[in-house]
Amino acid sequence: MFYSPLDQFEIKPLLMVNNILTLALTNYTLYLIIVVSIIFGYTSIISNGRLGSTRWGVAIIAIYDTILNLVYSQIGKAGGHFFPLIFTIFNLIFAANLISMIPYSFAISAQLVAIVSFSLALWIGNVILGLYLHGWGFFALFVPSGTPLPLVPILVLIEALSYSSRAISLGLRLGANILSGHLLMLILGSLIVNLMSSSILGFIGGIVPIVAVIAITILEVGIAIIQAYVFSILLSGYIKDSVSLH
C-alpha cells in the first residue's frame, strides 16, 4: 500500500454522533482543544501571579516581556489595547507549532484553509478598526505622501492590492513553512528507514543521515518558534497601519 507524505495532514473523524445534526470530533478539533486548554492554563497562571522563581516562571515572564515590548515598539502608546489579542495569538501559534513537533501528533498550523481563514478574519478586523477610528480617512493609507497627482490612480491600485494580499499572505506564510518542514522530515525519515532496513551495509550507512535528520528537527523547532513571533510582528504592523495610517 502506498502512503503519501500528505496523509499526515488529513483531517480524520475520531468520533461521530448522528442525531438530528451530525457532529464529528476530528483530529484537528482534538488538537485545537488541547492547544486552547494549554492557553487557558497558561494565562490563568500569569493572571493569578503564581509564576514564582522557577525556570518555567522565568521563561513565561521572558515571553510575556518579549511580546509586550514587541507590541509597544510596533504600535506605540495604543499597543496596550491590543496586547492581550497579540499575546494570545502568539501563544496559540507557539503551542500549536511545538505540539506538532511531537511524533504522531497533528499539525493544525499546516491546515492552509483554516490558517488562511484565520488570517482573513484578522485582516477584516484590521479594516473595521481603521474605518472605526478614521472613517473614510482610512483610505488615505493607500495614497503615499508626496505622490504626483497623475500617478495617484496607479499607486492607489497597487497599494490596495498589496494591502489586500495581507489577508492571505499572513496565514499562508505560516502554513507553508510548517507544511514544508513536516514534509521534509517525513520524507527524509522514510528514506532513512528504508535504507537501514535494506541490508547491514544500508543500516551502517543510515547512521550518518540520522544525525542530519536530528539537526533538521532541531532547526524545525526553532522555525516553529520563529514563525509564531513573525506572525505577531506582522499582525502588530498591520494594526499600526490601521491605528496611525502609516
Curated annotation (Swiss-Prot):
Subunit structure, interactors included: F-type ATPases have 2 components, CF(1) - the catalytic core - and CF(0) - the membrane proton channel. CF(1) has five subunits: alpha(3), beta(3), gamma(1), delta(1), epsilon(1). CF(0) has three main subunits: a, b and c.
Gene3D superfamilies assigned to the protein according to its UniProt record, in alphabetical order: ATP synthase, F0 complex, subunit A (1.20.120.220)
CDD domains: ATP-synt_Fo_a_6 (cd00310)
Stored InterPro entries: ATP_synth_F0_asu, ATP_synth_F0_asu_AS, ATP_synth_F0_asu_bact/mt, F0_ATP_A_sf
Bilayer disposition of the protein: Multi-pass membrane protein
Protein name: ATP synthase subunit a
Gene Ontology biological process: proton motive force-driven ATP synthesis
Chain positions listed as propeptide in the UniProt record: 1-3
Domain of life: Eukaryota
GO MF entries: proton-transporting ATP synthase activity, rotational mechanism
GO CC terms in record: mitochondrial inner membrane; proton-transporting ATP synthase complex
Job description of the protein: Mitochondrial membrane ATP synthase (F(1)F(0) ATP synthase or Complex V) produces ATP from ADP in the presence of a proton gradient across the membrane which is generated by electron transport complexes of the respiratory chain. F-type ATPases consist of two structural domains, F(1) - containing the extramembraneous catalytic core and F(0) - containing the membrane proton channel, linked together by a central stalk and a peripheral stalk. During catalysis, ATP synthesis in the catalytic domain of F(1) is coupled via a rotary mechanism of the central stalk subunits to proton translocation.
Leader sequence segment: none
Transmembrane segments: 20-40, 56-76, 82-102, 112-132, 138-158, 176-196, 203-223
UniProt keywords, alphabetically: ATP synthesis, CF(0), Hydrogen ion transport, Ion transport, Membrane, Mitochondrion, Mitochondrion inner membrane, Transmembrane, Transmembrane helix, Transport
Family stated for the protein in its record: Belongs to the ATPase A chain family.
Localization in the cell: Mitochondrion inner membrane
Pfam families: ATP-synt_A
